[in-house]
A protein has these predicted regions:
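Catalytic-domain carbohydrate-binding cleft regions of carbohydrate-active enzymes
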Residues: 2-22, 26-54, 58-634, 638-640
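Accessory, solvent-exposed terminal regions and/or long lumenal/extracellular loops of proteins
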Residues: 641-730
Length: 730
């Protein structure tokens, strides 16, 4: 076995290993130190020989088609398995401390942040985003430099990675003062998060699905006539003609003049996002073009995103059929295109079985050592070609899966097709934290849950005609928005969503527009509208957080441990988080007014227990009431409020005087200062779109607050005169 140290840095250590021949095992310890302390020791690296195989057609192909939850899938029935060469599986073991928290590794379903004494199957599927980056509280992180499926396992003080297929192997160890520093080292190796346009941080309205350009226009009119801010409306699947799954040409009978419809949205300062798929019906023109070019993955109707020419062809279809209509964003759905073996059936399979099923299916069409990275190459093709053809528009790619480094390609990742329940919502808080600790800055979810109904099959969406149980289709609300219990859940979820990096409503079974939950004067409707407006009041702060992510590697949605590493209690909290440096967010995750089935609840306290970390003081955002850190409070949690606290020393730029209907021409006019500690914040501003900022065309206003003097300054005399300065606290 040949070991190569790839660099001489002390904070980024890159080790590569090449097997000589046969089975090889290296048990010579390799230690990694932070200061005078050994924080991690490699105890074993083993290459285990294995055969790889490929699937070829036996004679004339017998092509079969079937509909799945991920659309139309084609496969060749008469496949033959042939040897394809020699490879290895890799076993990598470390000895670590017994007390540090083990975090990251992507986003999953179980809502568990600390992975100690657990097994994590790192693969790509609906509701799973596998990122082989382990972040710890002991000054180190580990990045596995592989595109293969793999398994992580922790047992007491032992950490093990089992990589399914490799020909050689390397990994990185990052060493730093804190978790934030280690994430910045990750970005140094994999690329910085890209800068999205300002509108991408506004409210995004989606549903499964708008069925015509008239519905798109009516939705835009609904927002503008009611004075509700919105920045984007989304066209989900089935924009194509009947039976032409994945074709990028819109059905002309329902969308007779798409450019005109998009212009209608643009005239109201509303952007347009379109769902696109990598799998295409063999009957559609896009598929035929790929087949003629020989750019499909074997045994599939999925384009070969690993191939540069295939990526160019896919983009050319997007450009001429979608982008030229004026579309502002692409939604790359089903970007893990071989997950149907998991995403089917009445029974949720055990984790090992799910992992093997997806891996076995993927192996029939992809190279075995690249089963996790399809979405990465898919995003790469969108980004590189978009940047060449539309430099005036920043890339926006909403994608269901991603892999290490996908953040440099203009991606927004969402958590997949989750169910509508408070249990799911609570787990999603932890999974959003997990995603951020894995390097994913722009994370979001389906506000209200994607699947809403349970067994009232006639209320199902997605053109579902089978009316049979499916393990993933088990929401708590058979009547959807007609059930006040669902309206309560939706409001709580939207409050949570207003404090995520990307603010997006989506789902099936029931409509999602604000007016579906009532009209002015109804507490559900009024609360929805108020939190959308609050999002826009905070937009100068939020857009500045995005700039800090792009320029400095600061993540937006933060575990409490990021800001309070010395608070042991903070490490136990999985249902609160920091949104930037100022806000502690504590979503409400239980019914207080109704239970499913329109059952009104009596005498349920409208309070939420919130832990406020030590090391600073905290202000209730709504009342300004002060609380000492290191305490637990029972915050007011009536439906109109989500518990929200602001840290002492926070400087928060806002747009207060006039809440805009979109992010266009958005400017900060007020700065909120929360007394009790010194503070700082850099207000970022640019044109909001395009890439001129890369040439220095942006401005930074560096606010600095001295609590002793109770003075806010910028270093430039007269700068603060542009803002109303509002102080909170003693």
């Amino acid at each position: 076995m040949i070991k190569i140290r790839e660099n001489d840095r002390k904070d980024i250590i890159h080790l590569s290993f090449i097997p000589d021949s046969g089975a090889e095992k290296n048990s010579d310890p390799i230690s990694f130190r932070w200061g005078d302390e050994t924080v991690l020791t490699q105890t074993e690296l083993a290459f285990l020989p294995q055969k790889t195989y490929r699937y070829v057609c036996d004679g004339e192909p017998v092509v079969k088609k079937k509909m799945t939850a991920n659309g139309e899938v084609s496969y060749i029935e008469n496949m033959e398995i042939l040897p394809d060469g020699d490879a290895y599986s890799v076993r990598l073991r470390f000895k670590a401390g017994k007390d540090e928290l083990l975090m990251g590794l992507g986003q999953y379903e179980d809502g568990i942040i600390n992975k100690r004494n657990s097994r994590v199957y790192i693969y790509e599927s609906n509701m799973r985003i596998g990122i082989p980056f382990l972040l710890t509280t002991a000054h180190y992180g580990i990045l596995i430099d592989s595109e293969s499926s793999m398994i992580f396992e922790s047992r007491d003080d032992e950490i093990e990675f089992s990589i399914d297929t490799a020909y050689s192997f390397s990994y990185y160890v990052f060493l730093g003062t804190d978790m934030g520093k280690i994430i910045k080292l990750l970005y140094e190796v994999t690329g910085m998060p890209s800068m999205l346009p300002s509108w991408a941080f506004g409210y995004i309205q989606s549903r499964e699905r708008y069925r015509s350009e008239e519905e798109l226009k009516e939705t835009a009119d609904g927002f503008r006539s009611r004075g509700i801010p919105v920045d984007c409306i989304v066209q989900d699947w089935y924009s194509w003609g009947e039976g032409l799954w994945g074709n990028k040409t819109f059905d002309s009978s329902r969308y007779p003049d798409l450019p005109s419809a998009v212009k209608y949205l643009h005239d109201s300062d509303i952007h347009f996002m379109v769902s696109i798929w990598p799998n295409m019906s063999p009957d559609c023109d896009d598929f035929k073009e790929f087949k003629k070019a020989g750019r499909l993955l074997p045994n599939s109707n999925v384009y070969d995103a690993f191939d540069e020419e295939a990526r160019k062809l896919y983009w050319s279809q997007c450009r001429r059929q979608i982008m030229e209509s004026g579309t502002d964003a692409l939604w790359c759905d089903n970007s893990e295109p071989f997950s149907d073996a998991d995403w089917s059936g009445e029974r949720k399979k055990p984790e090992e079985e799910r992992y093997r099923a997806v891996m076995d299916t993927s192996r029939m069409s992809m190279k075995w050592d690249k089963l996790n990275s399809y979405s990465l190459y898919h995003a790469k093709g969108i980004y590189e070609n978009w940047r060449r053809d539309y430099p005036e528009k920043r890339v926006v790619n909403l994608t269901r899966s991603g892999y290490t480094g996908c953040w440099r390609y203009g991606t927004i990742l969402w958590s997949g097709d989750i169910t509508a329940s408070f249990d799911t919502m609570k787990k999603q808080i932890a999974e959003g934290i997990n995603a951020s600790l894995s390097g994913i800055v722009y994370w979001t979810l389906d506000i209200g849950g994607f699947f809403v109904v349970d067994d009232k099959y006639e209320n199902r969406g997605c053109n579902d005609r089978e009316h049979k149980p499916l393990w993933f289709w088990h929401g708590d609300y058979n009547e959807g928005v007609k059930d006040p219990a669902y309206r309560e859940l939706y409001v709580r979820w939207l409050q949570f969503g207003a404090f995520l990096p990307v603010f997006r409503s989506h789902g099936t079974d029931t409509p999602r527009e604000p007016w579906q939950f009532g009209e002015a004067g109804d507490r559900f409707y009024d609360t929805i509208v108020e939190f959308i407006r609050l999002r826009y009041r905070l937009m100068p702060y939020i857009y500045s957080l995005a700039a800090a992510a792009h320029m400095k590697g600061e993540i937006m949605m933060r575990s409490l441990l990021m800001d309070f590493p010395d608070d042991d209690e903070a490490g136990k909290i999985s249902d609160e988080y920091m949104f930037g440096p100022a806000f502690l967010v504590a979503p409400v995750t239980e019914h207080m007014y109704y239970s499913p089935g329109s059952v009104e609840l009596k005498d349920v306290p409208k309070k939420r227990s919130v832990y406020l970390p030590k090391g600073c003081g905290w202000y209730d955002y709504y009342t300004g009431e002060y609380h000492e850190g290191g305490t637990r409070v029972y915050a007011d949690a009536v439906i109109e409020k989500m518990p929200l606290f602001v840290r002492t020393g926070s400087v928060v730029p806002m747009a207060v005087k006039k809440v805009p209907m979109s992010t266009k021409d958005l400017k900060a006019d007020t700065v909120m200062v929360y007394k009790g500690a010194d503070g700082a914040f850099d207000l970022y501003s640019d044109s909001g779109d395009g890439y001129a900022f890369e040439k220095g065309e942006y401005s930074l206003t560096a606010f600095r607050y001295s609590d002793k003097e109770q003075v806010l300054s910028t270093g430039n005399e007269g700068d603060t005169d542009r803002f109303d300065i509002c102080f909170t606290g003693r």
